[in-house]
Amino acid sequence: MSDSKMDKLARMAPLPRTPLLTIWLAINMALIAQETGHKRIHTVQAATGGGSMLGDVNISAILDSFSVSYDKRVRPNYGGPPVEVGVTMYVLSISSLSEVKMDFTLDFYFRQFWTDPRLAYRKRPGVETLSVGSEFIKNIWVPDTFFVNEKQSYFHIATTSNEFIRVHHSGSITRSIRLTITASCPMNLQYFPMDRQLCHIEIESFGYTMRDIRYKWNEGPNSVGVSSEVSLPQFKVLGHRQRAMEISLTTGNYSRLACEIQFVRSMGYYLIQIYIPSGLIVIISWVSFWLNRNATPARVALGVTTVLTMTTLMSSTNAALPKISYVKSIDVYLGTCFVMVFASLLEYATVGYMAKRIQMRKQRFMAIQKIAEQKKQQLDGANQQQANPNPNANVGGPGGVGVGPGGPGGPGGGVNVGVGMGMGPEHGHGHGHHAHSHGHPHAPKQTVSNRPIGFSNIQQNVGTRGCSIVGPLFQEVRFKVHDPKAHSKGGTLENTVNGGRGGPQSHGPGPGQGGGPPGGGGGGGGGGGPPEGGGDPEAAVPAHLLHPGKVKKDINKLLGITPSDIDKYSRIVFPVCFVCFNLMYWIIYLHVSDVVADDLVLLGEE
């Protein structure tokens, strides 16, 4: 009741005549005064802006009015045009980028913008936008946005939930939240470690198709920002780009946004830990080319150590990378270094093998020289006996002179000397047969040629101990010495002297024969004709026996080169090949890996 009502009531009431009536009036007046005081207090609070009042605007009343007939389960404009949701991002940091897991982790602000007409209110001075806490999210509809390639994510809640809502008087809503997301990033490591990776974050509605929600970049090309303080140990952020697309799935067509960030790998770590050490290992393997080829322990130990070191380096490098099937650029470099180190080891194996073969040839040649010297001395004795005939001499026909088994060849061996006289084959064969078959003591006297018998006319065979001197145009000494070691190597001393198997001089008299064929005294039988096969008789004799001086020069070579030549060539060929490979490798891979994505906004040009 107001004061005027109280005055009116007092005038109308008659004056009390008893104390009880006075007490009743006092109580009523006290109750009326208390009610009036409460009303005045509420009026003062409203005038001073207390509670949820801003001037004459009640903020709480505005927020409470949003819940009247509002259903957060239904999107705005349901049944009408789709809701357009604008998106912006600002990347604060990128903490990791893993080649093994094929993912990257980034921390960013994620903002969404949309309009809900049900949240519009009348514009008042000073109240154009309402900033409310994250609890208000539970009372309104929000887009069901999710990250398609997300592996793991979490919200930041220190010290409170890092999220806010702004409601504009027109019904436009802004939602901002801080997120940390680990997203998958398929990588192509073909040019590793000179590669450039393009990682992306894809944004899409989980349940609403394009008939209900369409996403767009809210600020056009400037919707994505990256802090200039972003840094990674092995990568540099080159730039970013943004795309909008439509994805068709079995449940319908969906609107999707993609933010792509390109990274460039820093090569400092790999240069220090892999490239330079592997190059030095290759260079160390070349030290063996300057060591003496007889220093087998040093050269073998150096070669094996470098090969094992390269194997360990390759294994440790690939252990930190995913098991992929294609070849990476670092595999090309390490593989080439391994091949060159292994080739250095094989080079010494080749040098050792050639030195062993040459040493075996020297030993065989020295054995041949020793045996030839002994037989030459025996032939000198035979020539002396020809000049001074003895009763044991068996003189044949015009074809030659024969010395029996007891001749100058010593026990068990015989010497048959045939001296051609320039007669034809028939004449030589006829006299030879007559002398040999009848043993006529009065055979026609023949003139024995005094042509010296040289070392070049010696032919040795393995397995027979016999010697013969054959004419007519040249004299040949044949003897056989059993040499199982030489025979096991695919050759004989006879081959060494004659220059190989199957030559025209390889058909000597059989074992134990003291004379030649029936037509010739001691194997002469040919008159003055050339040896079998025709041509120059000295052509059948090996050149290294006709020219002993040249033998000493060529015997130290195999296939025209010496072991020392291989070391000399390797000192030049290996470094040149490695330098050429490095030039080609770095030029090609640095060029082909320098790829920048189209429409890329470089960092610092935002």
Swiss-Prot record:
The keyword Transport applies. It comes from the Eukaryota. Activated by agonist muscimol. Insensitive to zinc, glycine, glutamate, and baclofen, loreclezole, to antagonist bicuculline, glycine-receptor antagonist strychnine, and nonselective GABA and glycine antagonist RU 5135. Insensitive to flunitrazepam, pentobarbitone or pregnane steroids such as 5alpha-pregnan-3alpha-ol-20-one. Inhibited by insecticides picrotoxin (PTX), cyclodiene dieldrin, TBPS and lindane. Inhibited by ivermectin, fipronil and pyrafluprole. One of its GO terms (cellular component) is neuron projection membrane. It is found in: Cell membrane; Postsynaptic cell membrane; Cell projection, Dendrite; Cell projection, Axon. Changing I283V: In RNA edited version; does not alter GABA receptor activity; retains inhibition by picrotoxin; shows resistance to picrotoxinin. Residues 1-44 form the signal peptide. Residues 357-568 are cytoplasmic. Residues 396-425, 499-536 have a biased composition (Gly residues). Residues 381-395 have a biased composition (Low complexity). Keywords: Cell membrane, Cell projection, Chloride, Chloride channel, Disulfide bond, Glycoprotein, Ion channel, Ion transport, Ligand-gated ion channel, Membrane, Postsynaptic cell membrane, Receptor, Signal, Synapse, Transmembrane, Transmembrane helix, Transport. The chain crosses the membrane at residues 269-291, 297-316, 333-356, 569-590. GO terms for biological process: chloride transmembrane transport; inter-male aggressive behavior; monoatomic ion transport; negative regulation of synaptic transmission; olfactory behavior; regulation of circadian sleep/wake cycle; regulation of olfactory learning; response to mechanical stimulus. Expressed in different parts of the brain: the mushroom bodies (alpha, alpha', beta, beta', gamma lobes and peduncles), the neurons projecting to the columnar-type neuron LC9 optic glomerulus, in interneurons connecting the paired olfactory lobes, antennal lobes, PDF-expressing small and large ventral lateral neurons (LNvs) of the circadian clock and lobula columnar neuron 11 (LC11) (at protein level). Expressed in all major ON pathway medulla neurons (Mi1, Tm3, Mi4, and Mi9) and in OFF pathway neurons (Tm1, Tm2, Tm4, and Tm9). Changing M360I: Decreases sleep latency. Residues 45-268 are extracellular. Residues 430-443 have a biased composition (Basic residues). Residues 376-451, 482-542 are annotated as: Disordered. Disulfide bonds join C185-C199. Resistance is thought to be due to insensitivity of the cyclodiene/picrotoxinin binding site on the GABA(A) receptor-chloride ionophore complex. Forms oligomers. Interacts with Nlg4; the interaction mediates Rdl clustering. Interacts with Fbxl4; the interaction mediates Rdl degradation. Gamma-aminobutyric acid (GABA) receptor voltage channel subunit. GABA, an inhibitory neurotransmitter, mediates neuronal inhibition by binding to the GABA receptor and opening an integral chloride channel. Together with glutamate receptor GluClalpha, plays an important role in the visual response by regulating the activity of ON/OFF-selective neurons. Plays a role in promoting sleep and sleep latency by regulating the activity of peptidergic PDF neurons. PANTHER family: NEUROTRANSMITTER GATED ION CHANNEL (PTHR18945). Belongs to the ligand-gated ion channel (TC 1.A.9) family. Gamma-aminobutyric acid receptor (TC 1.A.9.5) subfamily. This is Gamma-aminobutyric acid receptor subunit beta. It comes from Drosophila melanogaster. The gene is Rdl.
